């Protein structure tokens, strides 16, 4: 629209499990494919992102996009999904004044999106300071008024890993042993033991 697009928040919750991923929030097929691509990229590069590869078989991931009654689709949330997953897996927060848009491939490339002007207007409206966009959209900035661009710090990226240096409030280190999710697995075992004890008691 003339006034701009909208900002989507993405929530990720991790729990002990068997490697399942749940996506909620009335998401369309293309957006679900973005989740699959982002997670596939993370799994194949987990050591680089500071995540123990064994983790993925021991946890379930629930990704939710609020305002569940509103249908959502399209590939432009790809790098946002990727960053949200990395943030949850590494326990490094995302800066609150950063927004991003871009399709992600299985190899971590960031592909161009449509409606750049509308997305920038939405960021301004929500008080966002920094917006990350695909490098391939750089040519589209020529058609966007300078007064819009001057209200934002616009970062152009070619690969998803570049997003992390801009968006995360901390640096990722390779395989942080403290974050190997043993505490989640341990908690899961405690719960199972408790359930077994309760069943034995009932029987």
Where in this protein do the model-derived segments appear?
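Peripheral, non-AAA+ core regions of ATP-driven protein-machinery
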Residues: 3-203
């Amino acid at each position: 629209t003339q006034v701009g697009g909208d900002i989507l928040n993405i929530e990720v919750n991790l729990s002990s499990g068997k490697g399942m991923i749940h996506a909620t929030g009335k998401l369309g097929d293309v957006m679900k494919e973005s989740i699959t691509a982002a997670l596939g990229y993370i799994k194949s590069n987990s050591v680089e992102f500071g995540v123990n590869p064994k983790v993925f078989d021991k946890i379930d991931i629930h990704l939710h996009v609020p305002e569940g009654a509103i249908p959502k689709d399209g590939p432009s949330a790809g790098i946002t999904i990727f960053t949200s997953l990395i943030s949850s897996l590494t326990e490094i927060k995302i800066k609150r004044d950063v927004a991003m848009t871009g399709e992600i491939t299985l190899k971590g490339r960031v592909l161009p999106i449509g409606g750049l002007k509308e997305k920038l207007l939405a960021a301004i409206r929500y008080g966002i300071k920094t917006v990350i966009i695909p490098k391939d959209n750089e040519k589209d900035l020529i058609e966007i008024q300078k007064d819009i661009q001057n209200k934002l710090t616009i970062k152009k990226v070619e690969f998803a890993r570049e997003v992390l240096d801009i968006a995360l409030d901390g640096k990722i280190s390779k395989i942080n042993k403290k974050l190997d999710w043993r505490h989640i697995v341990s908690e899961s075992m405690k719960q199972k033991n408790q359930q077994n004890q309760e069943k034995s008691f009932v029987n």
